[in-house]
Amino acid sequence: MNNADRLKRQKSIRNFSIIAHIDHGKSTLADRILEKTGALTSREMKDQTLDAMDLERERGITIKLNAVQLKYTAKDGEEYILHLIDTPGHVDFTYEVSRSLAACEGAVLVVDAAQGIEAQTLANVYLALDNDLEILPIINKIDLPSADVERVRQEIEDVIGLDASEAVPTSAKAGIGIEEILEQIVAKVPAPTGDPEAPLEALIFDSYYDAYRGVVASIRVVNGTVKVGDKIRMMSTGKDFEVLELAVSTPKPLRQKELTVGDVGTLSASIKTVGDVRVGDTITLAKQPAQEALPGYRKMNPMVYCGLYPIDAARYNDLREALERLQLSDAALEFEPETSQALGFGFRCGFLGMLHMEIIQERIEREFNIDMITTAPSVIYHVTTTAGEVLHVDNPSKMPEQQKVEFIEEPYVKAAVMTPNDYVGAIMELCQKKRGTFIDMEYIDTTRVKITYELPLSEIVYDFFDQLKSSTKGYASLDYELIGYQQSRLVKMDILLNNENVDALSFIVHRDFAYERGKVIVDKLKELIPRMQFEVPIQAAVGTKIVARSTIKALRKNVLAKCYGGDISRKRKLLEKQKEGKKRMKMVGSVEVPQEAFMSVLSMDED
C-alpha cells in the first residue's frame, strides 16, 4: 500500500469504545452493531459475542476488553472502517476501561432509560474525558415499560454536562436506533491523527498467551507503519523481535501484511516470556526507533491481597504457571511466593477488588484444574515502628508485635453511592457501621441521591457491596477511588488452637470491634473443627491478651460401662486413669483444621 492510500484509509477509520454501568446493555449493543455491519451472519450470532470467556457469559458481565474491526457503508456512500473496543463496566475493572480508551478517539456512552445515570457511568465518563474522547450519549432500553427518555436526557445534561439533545434513543435488544448510532460515530468521532511515514509508535493495550505463537500483543498504531518481517523493539525493555504475523479481528482473525496509523490489531513475534510484553508499552522499529515512548497509562496498583495455596503441595509449580499465564492478559494481577506454617507453600496475590479476586480464583480452578485454599483478603497497611521504620504490610501474619508499633495507617477510599432516596437512611447506617465519615449528599433529581462517604478500604473489601445491595433491594450503585492513608487504631488478632497460633487465620481489625469479631470467629471455628479425643481450646488474642475463647469438648469413651454396681472408689480410679491419658494426649496431639474453617473466617458475616 502506498502512502496516499494509507492516508485515504486513515481518514475512513473510526476508533470507538462503548462505556456504561453494569447491566445497561453494553454487550447487547455490541452484538447489534456486529450484526448491522454484517461482521457475523445471523447463524454465527450468539448473545454476548465479544465476551469470549464462559465465566463472562455465566455471570453476564464483561471482564476482558475485546477489539473488532467492522466495515460500514454510511448514508453518504463512503465505506468506513470502525474499530469497536468493548470494555467492562464493573468498578474492579476500571483499568481495563482506561486501557481500551487509550486506544480510541471516541466513546459511546450507554445509559439505561429506566435506571438513569449510575455511579459507574460517571466514573467511566471522567476516564473518557481524561483521554480527550468525543463522547456520544445514547439512551438504551427504550422498549421497557418504565423507560423515561426525557428524564434521562435531562439527567445526562445536568449530572454529566454533556449535550444530550442528539442522544439516540435505542433498544439494543429490539435493534432500534442502531443505524443512527453508526451514523453519529462516522460523523462525530474524529479520524485518527498520525503520520504513516513517521517512525513507528504502537501502543500495547492488551496481550494474551497462545500455545503455538507465544505471546500475542493487541496494539493500536499511533504513528508509522508495521509490516510482517519488520524488526521491532519494545521501548521499556529494549528487546528486539521479528514480526511473524499481523491480524485484525473481524471477530474472526484476518491476517494482514501491514498495520498503519489508526489500525487496531494483534501482533505476534515469537515472544516467549510473559515479561517482555508489558501492557502500556510502546513498540517501535529497531532500525528507525521513535524518540520517546507514548504516554502509557498509569500502573494499576492492587488494592486487595490474599494468599493462594494449592491443596496438593505437588501442584505448586502448576499454580505458578497458571498465575503467570493469567498475568499476561491481566496487567493488574501481582503475585509473589510465600510460605505459611499452617498451609505450606503458596503465593501472595494482589487484586484490584473482590470481584477481580473471585474471577481469578475461579479461572485458575476452571482453566487449570487446581484446587486451592485462599486466606482472608487484606489490604496494604503502612506500619510505623517505634524505631521510626515504615513497613508496608500486606499479610496480617507479618505485622510486628504490638509493643514495637508506633502507629498504623490504613488506605481510605472516597465512595460515591447513588440510590433512590427511600434508602438514604439504610445507606448512612451501613456507612456509619463501617467506620465511614459523611462528606456530601446531593439530589440528582427528585427521586435519586448521590451520597459521598470516606471509608476505610478494608471495610469495603469484605462484604460492603453485598450489604449495600441487600439494604437497598439492589437499587444502589457504588463507585470508589483511593484517596490516601489515614491513621487508625488497628490491632492484629491471632487465633490460637490448642495454644498454638495458626498464622493463616490471623487478621487485622479495629480495636473497638476486636471483641465482637473475635467472638464471632471463635464460635464459628468451634462448629467447624471436628472433635478430638482431647479438649481443644480456641482463643482469639490481641497481643498477649485473650479477648474471646471457646472450647471443643473431648470425645470420651464410657470407661464405667463394665462396672456393674461396683464401688465408687473403683469408678473414680478408672475416671482418674482416663483423665491422665487425655492429659498426655493433649500434650502431643495436633489439631486438623478443615478447609471449611479457613473459608468460614473469610465469609466475614457477623450475623
From Swiss-Prot:
InterPro entries: EF-4, EFG_III/V, EFG_V-like, EFTu-like_2, G_TR_CS, LepA_C_sf, LepA_CTD, LepA_IV. The keyword Membrane applies. The keyword Membrane applies. It catalyses: GTP + H2O = GDP + phosphate + H(+). Signal peptide: none annotated. Its EC number is 3.6.5.n1. It is an enzyme of class 3 (hydrolase). This is Elongation factor 4. It comes from Exiguobacterium sibiricum (strain DSM 17290 / CCUG 55495 / CIP 109462 / JCM 13490 / 255-15). The lineage of its organism: Bacteria, Bacillati, Bacillota, Bacilli, Bacillales. The gene is lepA.
